[in-house]
C-alpha cells in the first residue's frame, strides 16, 4: 500500500484519467529509471509538502496543534471551512486573469470567468440584494485593499472623510492618525476627522458626530468598527450623510456573516457602498468584497430624466487597474464556497450561537466583577476594560498566551498608550465554529479570570512590562501556576472538533 503522503499526492490526480495515473506510477517505478528526454528529469510537481519541505510541514503541523489545543478568542479570526480551503489550494492559483469576466487581458479565462460570475451572484444572494440595484466586485485581495479601492473610487485626493477613532473601536483604514503622524494611508491621501464614543455610555456619540460633520463637511462617512460590541445605527448615519451631502460607506468586515444570517440589522438599506472581509464571521478564505448601489439614483425634478448611480465603473476601475493586477482566482473560488454556506439554515444557527456565546461570555465576565465597554454586547465580541482591575491589556494578553488562550490587547476610550492599552478584546466566532456553547464559554471565562489573577499577582512584584514578561518565565512558583492552568486549558480545548484539514 502506498504511504499516506503519496496517496495524498495522487488522490486529486485520479480524477484526471488513466494516463495521469500511469504517469505517476512510472515516476516511482522501474520505468522512471529508463525513461529518456523530458520525462527522465524526474520532476513532476506532484511531490507532497511533507516530502518536499519537511521543515515547513513541521511548522504547519505545529500551528495546527496550537490551534487545536488552544482557545482562540481573537474577534477577527475564525476557522475556515475545509471546502473553501480545498478551493484555495487548487489549480486556480495557476491562472492569471487581469480584467473582468468577458474583458480579460489574458486568454484561457473562460472557466475563471464563470467562477467570478458565480461568486458575484452568490455574494448578492447571501445578502438578499437585487442585481438591478446592487453590484459587487469580488476581486479585492482583502479588507484593507477593498477600503482603499472604495475611497479611490468615491473621492478625490485630499477629500474629507470621517471614521470611528481607532482608540474608540475603529479601524486603521478609517483614517487613523496620531498627534504626530498620519499612520494610515487613508489619512495620508485624504483629510480625516474621527468621530468618537460617548465616554459615559461607551456608545457611538451620534449627536457629536453630526455636529462635527456639519463643521468638517466630509465627502465620505464610514460606518464600521473593529472593536465595538454594539450595533451601528445606520439610519442615523444616513441622516447625517444626507444633511452634509456625504456618501455613506459601511465597513461590515467583522459582522458580515451575522448580517448574511439576518441575526443583526443590515447596512444595505442605508449605505451607498458596503465593504467586507470574508474570513471573519463569514468563515471563508481571506479576501475582500465591495458592494455598490446601481440603477436609478434619483429623477431630475425639472426634466423628469432618470439619474443613475455611477459607482460601478468607478469602483471596478479603482480595483483594476488602479490598485491591483490579476485577481486571486483561487481566493475568489474559496469565497464563493463560503458564500454558498452562508445561505444555509446551518449557517444561521451558527450565527445565532455566536451571539448567544458572546452574551454568555459578557454575562460571566460581569458576574466576576469585570468592566465591559458599553456594558455588554449585541454582536460577536466583548471589550473588557481591565483598568478598574489594575491591569492592562498587554499584560493580560501575555499571561493568557502562555496558557494557550489567544486574545488581543485593545485600546479603550480614553487610553493614551497603544503599547499598554487598558482593554482586552474577546470574540466568539472561532470557538463557536468548534461547537462551543454557552456553558463552554462560561468555562472559558473561568480560565481567563485565573489568568488575570496571575497577572495581577505578578504585576505587584514587577515594574515595567518587560520585567513582567521575564518574571512570568523565570519565577518558579509563577511558572508552576501557568503550567497547571495551561494543562487544564489544553485538555479542555482538545475535546472539541476543529474545521479544516485534519493535519494542517
From Swiss-Prot:
Cellular compartments per GO CC: BRISC complex; cytoplasm; mitochondrial inner membrane; mitochondrial matrix; mitochondrial nucleoid; mitochondrion; nucleus
MF terms (GO), sorted A to Z: chromatin binding; glycine hydroxymethyltransferase activity; pyridoxal phosphate binding
This protein's pathway: One-carbon metabolism; tetrahydrofolate interconversion
Keyword Iron attached: no
Description of activity control: Hydroxymethyltransferase is inhibited by succinylation at Lys-280.
The reaction(s) this protein catalyses: (6R)-5,10-methylene-5,6,7,8-tetrahydrofolate + glycine + H2O = (6S)-5,6,7,8-tetrahydrofolate + L-serine
The protein's name: Serine hydroxymethyltransferase, mitochondrial
Post-translational modification note: Succinylation at Lys-280 inhibits the hydroxymethyltransferase activity. Desuccinylation by SIRT5 restores the activity, leading to promote cell proliferation.
Keywords: Acetylation, Cytoplasm, Membrane, Mitochondrion, Mitochondrion inner membrane, Mitochondrion nucleoid, Nucleus, One-carbon metabolism, Phosphoprotein, Pyridoxal phosphate, Transferase, Transit peptide
Role, per record: Catalyzes the cleavage of serine to glycine accompanied with the production of 5,10-methylenetetrahydrofolate, an essential intermediate for purine biosynthesis. Serine provides the major source of folate one-carbon in cells by catalyzing the transfer of one carbon from serine to tetrahydrofolate. Contributes to the de novo mitochondrial thymidylate biosynthesis pathway via its role in glycine and tetrahydrofolate metabolism: thymidylate biosynthesis is required to prevent uracil accumulation in mtDNA.
Domain of life: Eukaryota
Phosphoserine found at: 470
Residues found modified as N6-succinyllysine: 280
N6-(pyridoxal phosphate)lysine: modified positions: 280
Essential cofactor(s): pyridoxal 5'-phosphate
Top EC class, one word: transferase
Annotated organelle transit peptide span: 1-29
Pfam families assigned to the protein according to its UniProt record, in alphabetical order: SHMT (PF00464)
SUPFAM superfamilies hit by this protein: PLP-dependent transferases (SSF53383)
Lineage of the species this protein comes from: Eukaryota, Metazoa, Chordata, Craniata, Vertebrata
Amino acid at each position: 500500500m502506498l504511504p499516506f503522503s503519496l496517496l495524498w499526492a495522487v488522490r486529486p490526480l485520479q480524477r484526471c484519467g488513466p494516463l495521469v495515473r500511469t504517469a505517476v506510477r512510472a515516476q516511482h517505478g522501474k520505468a522512471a529509471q529508463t525513461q529518456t528526454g523530458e520525462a527522465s528529469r524526474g520532476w513532476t510537481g506532484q511531490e507532497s509538502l511533507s516530502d518536499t519541505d519537511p521543515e515547513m510541514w513541521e511548522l504547519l503541523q505545529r500551528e495546527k496543534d496550537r490551534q487545536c489545543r488552544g482557545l482562540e478568542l481573537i474577534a477577527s479570526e475564525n476557522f475556515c471551512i475545509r471546502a473553501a480551503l480545498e478551493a484555495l489550494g487548487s489549480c486556480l492559483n495557476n491562472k492569471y486573469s487581469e480584467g473582468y469576466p468577458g474583458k480579460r487581458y489574458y486568454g484561457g479565462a473562460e472557466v475563471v470567468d464563470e467562477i467570478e460570475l458565480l461568486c458575484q451572484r452568490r455574494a448578492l444572494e447571501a445578502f438578499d440584494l437585487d442585481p438591478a440595484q446592487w453590484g459587487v466586485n469580488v476581486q479585492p485581495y482583502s479588507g484593507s485593499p477593498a477600503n482603499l479601492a472604495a475611497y479611490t473610487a468615491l473621492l478625490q485626493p485630499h477629500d474629507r472623510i470621517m471614521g470611528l477613532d481607532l482608540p474608540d473601536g475603529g479601524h486603521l483604514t478609517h483614517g487613523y492618525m496620531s498627534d504626530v503622524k498620519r499612520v494610515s494611508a487613508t489619512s495620508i491621501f485624504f483629510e480625516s476627522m474621527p468621530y468618537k464614543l460617548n465616554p459615559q455610555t461607551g456608545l457611538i456619540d451620534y449627536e457629536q458626530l453630526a455636529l462635527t460633520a456639519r463643521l468638517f463637511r466630509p465627502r465620505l462617512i464610514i460606518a464600521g468598527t473593529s472593536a465595538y460590541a454594539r450595533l451601528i445605527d445606520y439610519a442615523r448615519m444616513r441622516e447625517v450623510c444626507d444633511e452634509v451631502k456625504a456618501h455613506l460607506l459601511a465597513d461590515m468586515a467583522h459582522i458580515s456573516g451575522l448580517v448574511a444570517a439576518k441575526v443583526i440589522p443590515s447596512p444595505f438599506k442605508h449605505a451607498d457602498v458596503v465593504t467586507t472581509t470574508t474570513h471573519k464571521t463569514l468563515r471563508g478564505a481571506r479576501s475582500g468584497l465591495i458592494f455598490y448601489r446601481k440603477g436609478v439614483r434619483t429623477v431630475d425634478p425639472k426634466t423628469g430624466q432618470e439619474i443613475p448611480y455611477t459607482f460601478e465603473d468607478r469602483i471596478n476601475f479603482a480595483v483594476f487597474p488602479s490598485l491591483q493586477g490579476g485577481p486571486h482566482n483561487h481566493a475568489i473560488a474559496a469565497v464563493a464556497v463560503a458564500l454558498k454556506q452562508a445561505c444555509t439554515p446551518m449557517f444561521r444557527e451558527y450565527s445565532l450561537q455566536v451571539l448567544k456565546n458572546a452574551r454568555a461570555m459578557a454575562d460571566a465576565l460581569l458576574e466576576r466583577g469585570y468592566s465591559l465597554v458599553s456594558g455588554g454586547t449585541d454582536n460577536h465580541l466583548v471589550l473588557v476594560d481591565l483598568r478598574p482591575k489594575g491591569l492592562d491589556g498587554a499584560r493580560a494578553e501575555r499571561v493568557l498566551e502562555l496558557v494557550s488562550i489567544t486574545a488581543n490587547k485593545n485600546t479603550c476610550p480614553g487610553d493614551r498608550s497603544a503599547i499598554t492599552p487598558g482593554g482586552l478584546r474577546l470574540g466568539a466566532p472561532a470557538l463557536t465554529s468548534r461547537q462551543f456553547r454557552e456553558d463552554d464559554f462560561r468555562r472559558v471565562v473561568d480560565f481567563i479570570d485565573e489568568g488575570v489573577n496571575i497577572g495581577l499577582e505578578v504585576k505587584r512584584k514587577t515594574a515595567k512590562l518587560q520585567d513582567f514578561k521575564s518574571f512570568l518565565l523565570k519565577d518558579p512558583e509563577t511558572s508552576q501556576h501557568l503550567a497547571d492552568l495551561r494543562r487544564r486549558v489544553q485538555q479542555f480545548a482538545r475535546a472539541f472538533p476543529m474545521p479544516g484539514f485534519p493535519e494542517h
